[in-house]
Amino acid sequence: MTPNDLITPAPQWRWGRRLFLALVLGVLLLLATAAPAWASIHTYHEQPGQTTYRSRQSLRDQRDLAWQATVFKRYQGQTVQGLYLRLVGFPGQVAVDRQGNLQIDTGTTAHWAVPYALDPQTPASVLPDNVSQYEVSAVLNDMPRPIPLTLTVPLVGQSSTQIIVAPYVVEEWITIAQTFPEP
C-alpha cells in the first residue's frame, strides 16, 4: 500500500459520496421550490345553491390569549352574501364590545374602522359575548398585497386588545375575497 492509496478514496466510495450529495441536493431543491399549501381554506356546499369558502386560524393577542379568526364568504347561487371576519376569544377571558369598531391597521398608512355586522344566516342571539363578527370585504378588496395587519378588538370592561395577523394568513383571506363559485 502506497501513501497515495491512503489519500485518494477508492472509486466506489467516490460514486457513493456523489450519489448521496445528489440525493441531498434534490431533496433540498424540492423543499425550496414546493408551492405553499392552503390547507386551511375550505369549501362547504351547505345546501343546494349555497357555497361557503372559509379560512380558520388560531392567533394570539398581545396578552398571549388565544383567538380563533375565521374569514368566510358565503354565496347563495351566484350572489355573494358577504365576506366576514369572525373573532372568537376564550370564553370567560374576554367579552367583545360590539358597540365599538374593529380597528384594522397595516402599520403604514392604511387604516380601517369596521363596525360589528352579522351575516344573514346568523341570529344575533346565537353569538356569545366572546364572539364578534365584521363585514371585511372593503378591507380585503382594498389590500394591494398580503402584509401584516394589526387588529384592535374593543373589549367590555377592559382596554382593547391587539392581534397581529401574519402575511400568510392575510394572503389566505385575500384569496377567499377573490374566490367565486363555479357556475
Predicted regions mapped to residue ranges:
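Boundary at the C-terminal end of the N-terminal hydrophobic targeting segment
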Residues: 37-41
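Short, hydrophobic/aromatic beta-strand segments
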Residues: 95-101, 114-115, 162-164
